[in-house]
């Protein structure tokens, strides 16, 4: 049975970011690194993205935001998916930017 393998060329990734940033001018950009940067390595991709001018990160879940923080990043980290009420305090403690969709999550803050 074949094994899938993927490797990202960070030089090409950085080049692509520079091209995108050149079109955005002064518009802040986030690095969307959910699902381990779609399998490319969230930590490595975020480091490169921040060095190329991105201002923060977006992740799918609180757990992914915790990985960003545990890796030493202090940039803004937006959680795109709705956290469970019991995850709200973790997100707050990790200084993640959390979505709130109802009073249950609001009260959990």
Q: What function would you assign to each model-found segment?
A:
Residues 4-7, 12-14, 25-109:
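Active-site-proximal beta-alpha core segment in soluble small-molecule metabolic enzymes
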């Amino acid at each position: 049975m074949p094994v899938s393998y993927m490797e990202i060329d960070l030089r090409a990734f950085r080049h692509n970011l520079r091209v995108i940033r050149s079109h955005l001018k002064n518009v802040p950009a986030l690095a969307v690194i959910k699902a381990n940067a779609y399998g490319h390595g969230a930590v490595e991709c975020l480091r490169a993205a921040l060095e190329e001018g991105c201002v923060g990160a977006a992740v799918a879940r609180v757990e992914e935001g915790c990985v960003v923080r545990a890796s030493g990043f202090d940039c803004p980290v937006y959680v795109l998916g709705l956290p469970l009420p019991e995850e709200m305090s973790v997100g707050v403690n990790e200084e993640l930017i959390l979505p709130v969709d109802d009073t249950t999550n609001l009260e959990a803050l």
